[in-house]
Amino acid sequence: MSAITITDAAHDYLADLLSKQNTPGIGIRIFITQPGTQYAETCIAYCKPGEEKPDDTAVGLKSFTAYLDAVSVPFLEDALVDYATDRMGGQLTIKAPNAKVPMVNEDSPINERINYYLQTEINPGLASHGGQVSLVDVVDDGIAVLQFGGGCQGCGQADVTLKEGIERTLLERIPELKGVRDVTDHSQKENAYY
């Protein structure tokens, strides 16, 4: 299995759950909702025969078949499904380190590339101040319209962050981008960092 690893403990736990469904041929389907976004969630669901999608990748395991959602496969790279016992019985865990990482290249639409750099380079730094920035739109032939949130909304340094940090980074990474514009209502200062 190249994209995802299912440990023996997880396999045995899932096989036991599946056997209790009294459905011959039942397997699991692994998919990510909203892959490549900050809202991505990795999911495992029962998959009765016929419920798999035509473009799913079928992975035959010892006791059952795991179906991997085609759109999710790149985001499942290096994912791990494990089962650990504890005092309460045990817990199935899914770790998918690439689930929230946008998959973009030079040919991706400009909004996807902007979101990629916001998620991977800009927001991790802003998070230390309890803030984040998101893309609202791309207008006027290459102007990124951004909105601050959290500790950045109302912050006295937002303008400096926008021009010296965010705009500079985005212009270096995305040559056809012409600039950025902030549409945040900075009069709301109750959560502001500065």
Curated annotation (Swiss-Prot):
Amino acids binding [4Fe-4S] cluster: 152, 155
InterPro entries: Fe/S_biogenesis_protein_NfuA, FeS_biogenesis, FSCA_dom_sf, HesB-like_dom_sf, NIF_FeS_clus_asmbl_NifU_C
GO biological process terms held by the UniProt record: iron-sulfur cluster assembly; protein maturation
SUPFAM superfamilies (alphabetical): Fe-S cluster assembly (FSCA) domain-like, HesB-like domain
Alphabetically ordered keywords of this record: 4Fe-4S, Iron, Iron-sulfur, Metal-binding
Annotated cofactor note: Binds 1 [4Fe-4S] cluster per subunit. The cluster is presumably bound at the interface of two monomers.
Designated name of the protein: Fe/S biogenesis protein NfuA
Function text: Involved in iron-sulfur cluster biogenesis. Binds a 4Fe-4S cluster, can transfer this cluster to apoproteins, and thereby intervenes in the maturation of Fe/S proteins. Could also act as a scaffold/chaperone for damaged Fe/S proteins.
Family: Belongs to the NfuA family.
Cofactor: [4Fe-4S] cluster
One Pfam match: Fe-S_biosyn
Subunit architecture: Homodimer.
Entries under PANTHER family matching the protein: FE_S BIOGENESIS PROTEIN NFUA, IRON-SULFUR CLUSTER SCAFFOLD PROTEIN NFU-RELATED
UniProt GO molecular function: 4 iron, 4 sulfur cluster binding; iron ion binding
